[in-house]
Design a protein with these regions (language model features):
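Short loop/turn and low-complexity linker motifs enriched in small/turn-promoting residues
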Residues: 1-191
Length: 191
């Protein structure tokens, strides 16, 4: 999502909230107080959104050839392939930091990371870019030579704080998720 679309979304949400809540709050506190509180509230909401998204990084998209190779879902000879995909609307703009071994990257909704690794057991750790917004999660995966594992990362909202949820997808769900997301390059590539 571009920066313009992000700001338009923030403004649209704030406008809807103001339209729904403004009249009832205005009648309770009075017009003069409302003229002072409304701008302060709006500044607070916009400030929170800026803070929440400030740790996001714009990941570099892979070229079409790399994306086509990723969507084949076949590991190179003697290697295993691990995907971490992210889809959905909950906290879609919030970046998720993904770590597999020494590899590090960040994805948002509609994006995926892919790692070709040696066969073995790997710990995949995922946390929101702003760690205070959601509880991080880890999942261990054991993958053999020629094996392909797809992990879906999502944020599940709680009353006050969300939690990152990692799910290993079956073959049909895995293919659907990989085909529906765009490949992002690692910030620190797998070794």
């Amino acid at each position: 999502m571009s920066k313009n679309a992000m700001w338009l979304t923030i403004i649209f949400v704030a406008a809807i909230f103001g339209a729904l809540m403004g009249p009832s709050i205005g009648s309770l506190v009075g017009e003069g107080t409302m003229l002072i509180l409304a701008p302060l509230f709006l500044i607070g909401v916009v400030g929170f959104c800026i803070w929440a998204l400030s740790s996001n990084k714009s990941g570099k998209k892979a070229d079409p050839a790399a994306l086509a190779e990723a969507r084949r879902m076949q590991a190179p000879e003697g290697k295993a392939r691990i995907y971490v995909t992210r889809r959905g609307f909950v906290a879609a703009l919030q970046g998720m930091n993904v770590t597999i071994g020494g590899a590090q990257g960040q994805i948002k909704s509609g994006q995926m990371l892919m790692a070709d690794v040696d066969p073995g057991t790997y710990m995949i750790a995922v946390a929101t870019a702003k760690a205070k917004l959601a509880k991080p999660a880890e999942i261990a995966v054991d993958v053999g030579a020629g094996g392909v594992v797809v992990i879906d990362a999502m944020i599940e909202m709680g009353a006050l704080k969300g939690s990152v949820v990692l799910t290993r997808l079956d073959a049909a769900q895995a293919r659907e998720s990989v085909n529906a997301t765009k490949l992002i390059l690692w910030e620190v590539p797998p070794t």
